[in-house]
Amino acid sequence: MINIEKKDKIDIVSFSVAKINAMISDEIRDGINKVFDNSNSKVIIDLKGVEYIDSSGFGCFLSVMKTARNSYGILKFANPEPRVTDLLELLHLNTIFQIYSDMDSCLKSFN
């Protein structure tokens, strides 16, 4: 469900599910929060292939953002699908999260 790989000292989190909802949001939150156990972690959440996120999924990401800030980490998002982009904009979460349309630009933003 959740995959974490490291690239140039940046943890990249991806998902093997197309929907992030109440059924799995706690597991996702806990998995991503473990990455922030180390202070100053840099994390990208790769949303490629995620077609839908419900309110509990967005709540999960807001919780992870708080954890990141508390551990002096950085959290960014990459590759949102069009429907997810629409939801992020509708909920004005694009003003809270750093979101990049592709992985390369997201990785470069850390330099």
Where are these regions (language model features)?
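Short beta-strands and strand-loop turn motifs
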Residues: V13-S14, D46
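Thr-Gly-centered strand-to-loop micro-motif
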Residues: S14-F15, A22
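Amphipathic alpha-helical interaction surfaces in cytosolic regulatory modules
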Residues: I20-F97
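Short acidic-hydrophobic, aromatic-tinged amphipathic segments that line or gate anion-handling sites
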Residues: Q98-D102
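Generic C-terminal helix-cap and adjacent flexible tail
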Residues: S105-N111
